[in-house]
Design a protein with these regions (language model features):
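Surface-exposed extracellular loop regions of Gram-negative outer-membrane beta-barrel proteins
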Residues: 278-291, 339, 457, 475-525, ...
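Short strand-turn segments of transmembrane beta-barrel domains in outer membranes
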Residues: 153, 162-171, 181-216, 224-226, ...
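Gram-negative outer-membrane beta-barrel transporters
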Residues: 438-440, 541-548, 565-660, 731-733
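Membrane-embedded beta-barrel scaffold of Gram-negative outer-membrane proteins
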Residues: 322, 328-342, 472, 494, ...
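Transmembrane beta-barrel wall of Gram-negative outer-membrane proteins
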Residues: 201-230, 241-282, 307-328, 376-379, ...
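Periplasmic N-terminal accessory/gating domains of Gram-negative outer-membrane beta-barrel systems
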Residues: 39-52, 56, 64-74, 78-127, ...
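Flexible loop and strand-edge segments within Gram-negative outer membrane beta-barrel domains
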Residues: 32, 231, 245-247, 265-322, ...
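C-terminal beta-signal and adjacent terminal beta-strands/loops
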Residues: 234, 645, 659, 680-736
Length: 736
């Protein structure tokens, strides 16, 4: 196949899908609902009775609106199938049972799912099924574009009615970030007015305040939540001490969801989020400077003052409606801006690492997503969609360095400043067409085709077939299997366009030549699993997966800044096995997950300038473990509701250790963290009324463990897990 024919195919499928969508759009629309006139008639009617048990007009209106929203929510959910994939869900009740309740960071919520591996905050917090990142976040079915610092730290679990993690062989509508899809349904459909205020205080100067407000007025409903956190441990401690040095952080985030019913079949939704996070970069005492700065005394390593700021904002405007009785659709317009700014200590960074780099990475993206479902007949449901995105990224790098000889030895104590700025614009286009075929009462097949094209540092495209099968073997026993061809463009906000030539003859000279044209990852993914419902309380699950990869993407921290850059291995092999079980009754709930995985790759094919020659040579001839591979990971938890106002919870997190050493040839020791919490409600009477309290104890046995030791492929500073910490949370719920 020649190059031109490969490029033509995505356009052909896109035209076909667009034509299909247009045909549905031209169909006759169903008669408009008479809901508005009915509401007006109700508003004019006098009250029939003063009996408080008789529903008021306002209450009846709320019920009617809630019913309409429920139908629209169900229709929207049908736009996002999961046939053939693995799904692990957390309801808001499940999240409330975690040690920190709904104050649990979203990454830590996901850590309770099978196949999720813990890493440091700077590295993204978690890895799913052998991928470094490659997670897609969706709110009400709309994919959020990538952010420089990732969405996990931007989204708040308080906002979620349900969080689902989809993995495996995903249907054709899911593209680009496919290690896992974090699908979030919001609390925006509450049928009453109210809110909550909570405060949390605890170890290491942890001070957090949060508030939410929700309600409705006629056809308009809203849910708004915001929080502010201050802590003395914003990033993992690089030492084993209980209290890190220079690690303060201030984190602010807000999320809002608004929905307006236009009629029985249509609604407009707006959801938006903003974060503003500031971090001190923690210090390591007892180090000695490597370089000398003219007329400046040595700076103690515990007094280095480097900082980083991360900001992000997104907005999504979605219109949902239907055409006739068989067709539902949603079109969403989105916008996202984000930036990360590393501010070095001009003396400390320079004298200890030979470079003080003021680095700003910013990225903005906007586009649209269109999804359509047409129920052709009882056996076939056709789904189609389009995705288009335009983004612009900028990297500003003002590096102060020392002149150096060919061996990297400092030749002058007077530094020079080198500007290395770059701009990158790109676009992404995608289209899909798929059919959910109910072959019989036991068997459902979802087959489809996806076409994608990306233009950033390279122009690439791919046709991606998808196939998923679900078979009900017996009552309570369901088998699923799937195949997916994946196409993963590089995250443009993490493409490093460093100029190697500019830094020759300096203390920031790079070890090898550059290839900054990060390529799209291409993989064949196979997944098979079985779920067994023992009864209506207890379920078991087993899932196995394997992935063959070309141009495997990874990310690494190269330098002092907590900014990650993407690069490619030429080949990759990733696979694993997951076991899970859940149990739920009225007072006792529990879960347990165990996962075994392997993730290996060979041959660095882009970003070679970040690696030493001996490391490049070894990786070229050996299958090396990826730095985020953890052979065994496990989590288990138990929650017991003693009475209507008292709940006890606990969980255990285990990891066999991430990779370390030269070319990731060894791994860190295993680690276990045990966590407990007690939640108790009190009725204080008077103006205070009911108050909910929660005491949480994290890492109860104060285990000292390293997530990273600073060695390994593309690994930055050492990072230790959180030491024993105690938190007290007070929450006041109120009605309006």
């Amino acid at each position: 196949m020649n190059k031109h024919s490969l490029r033509a195919r995505p356009r052909t499928l896109a035209i076909a899908v667009a034509a299909t969508c247009a045909a549905f759009a031209l169909a006759a629309r169903a008669d408009e609902s008479a809901a508005a006139s009915a509401e007006a008639a109700q508003a004019e009617a006098p009250a029939a009775s003063a009996d408080p048990s008789t529903p008021t007009v306002d209450q009846l209106s709320r019920v009617e609106v809630a019913s309409k929203r429920s139908k629209l929510d169900e229709a929207r959910n049908q736009l996002s199938p999961d046939t053939g994939s693995s799904v692990y869900s957390f309801s808001d009740a499940d999240i409330a049972k975690l040690p920190l309740g709904d104050a649990t960071p979203l990454n830590q919520v996901l850590l309770r799912a099978p196949g999720v591996v813990q890493d440091s905050f700077a590295a993204g917090g978690v890895h799913v099924r052998g991928d470094h990142g490659n997670l897609q976040y969706r709110i009400e079915g709309v994919a959020l574009p990538d952010a420089v610092s990732g969405f996990a730290s931007a989204l708040d679990a308080r906002f979620a009615r349900q969080v689902s993690l989809l993995t495996g062989a995903l249907p054709a509508q899911y593209g680009y970030r496919t290690a896992g899809v974090v699908d979030i349904h919001t609390k925006g459909d509450l049928d009453e007015d109210g809110g909550s205020v909570s405060v949390t205080g605890g170890s290491l100067g942890h001070r957090e305040a949060a508030a939410s407000l929700f309600g409705s007025s006629g056809n308009l409903s809203w849910y708004v939540v915001g929080s502010q956190l201050q802590t003395d441990e914003g990033i993992e401690n690089p030492t084993a001490s209980k209290k890190p040095l220079h690690d303060d952080s201030k984190q602010q985030r807000g999320l809002a969801y608004l929905s307006y019913l236009l009629d029985d079949d249509s609604q407009i939704s707006l959801f938006a989020g903003v974060t503003n996070n500031r971090f001190q970069i923690p210090d390591v005492p007892g180090q000695s400077p490597t370089y000398t700065l003219a007329n400046t005394p040595p700076l103690d390593s515990s007094d280095i003052d480097a900082n980083q700021r991360e900001r992000m904002g997104f907005q999504v405007l979605a219109f949902q409606s239907k055409i006739g009785a068989k067709t539902d659709y949603q079109i969403a317009f989105f916008n996202r801006t984000s930036d990360v700014h590393y501010l070095p200590d001009p003396v400390g960074d320079l004298t200890y690492s030979g470079v003080a780099a003021d680095i700003l990475r910013s990225n903005s993206a906007h586009g649209l997503q269109f999804d359509l479902t047409h129920r052709l007949n009882p056996q076939h449901t056709i789904r189609a969609g389009l995705f288009a995105q335009r983004e612009v990224g900028y990297t500003g790098n003002a590096s102060t360095v020392f002149p150096a000889d060919a061996d990297g030895n400092q030749t002058s104590t007077t530094p020079i400043t080198i500007d290395d700025n770059s701009r990158l614009a790109g676009s992404t286009l995608g289209a899909y067409l798929q059919d959910e075929w109910k072959l019989n009462e036991r068997t459902t097949i979802n087959y489809g085709l996806r076409a994608d094209r990306v233009d950033t540092v390279t122009a690439e495209s791919q046709l991606s077939p998808r196939l998923g099968v679900v078979y009900d073997l017996a009552k309570g026993t369901r088998l699923h299997a799937g195949y997916a061809r994946y196409f993963t463009p590089p995250p443009s906000e993490k493409i490093d366009q460093t100029s190697v030539a500019k830094f020759l003859g300096t203390t920031n000279a790079l070890p090898s030549d550059a290839n900054t044209a990060v390529r799209s990852e291409r993989s064949n993914y196979y997944d098979v699993g079985v779920a067994q419902e023992i009864d209506d309380r207890w379920t078991l699950g087993v899932d196995a997966y394997w992935r063959d990869v070309r141009h495997l993407q990874d990310e690494g921290q190269f330098g002092s800044a907590f900014v990650f850059s993407a690069f490619n291995y030429s080949q990759g092999r990733i696979g694993g096995l997951e076991l899970s079980t859940t149990y739920k009754n009225k007072s006792l709930t529990g879960y347990a997950n165990v996962a075994v995985s392997t993730a290996r790759a060979r041959g660095i094919e882009t970003g070679q300038f970040n690696f030493a020659a001996d490391e490049l040579a070894y990786i070229a001839s050996h299958w090396v473990h990826l730095d985020h591979e953890e052979t065994v990971s496990a989590s288990t938890g138990l929650s017991w509701r003693y009475d209507a106002t008292t709940q006890f919870s606990g969980d255990v997190l285990y990891g066999s250790g991430l990779r370390n050493g030269f070319a990731n040839t060894t791994h860190l020791p295993s680690h276990t963290s045990v966590n407990f919490s007690v939640e108790k409600g009190f009725d204080l009477g008077g103006a205070f009324g009911k108050i909910d309290t929660r005491v949480a104890l994290l890492n109860a046995f104060d285990r000292v463990y390293e997530l990273r030791d600073g060695s390994g492929i593309s690994v930055g500073a050492p990072q230790f897990g959180q030491r024993r910490s105690v938190y007290l949370t007070l929450t006041k719920n109120f009605s309006l």
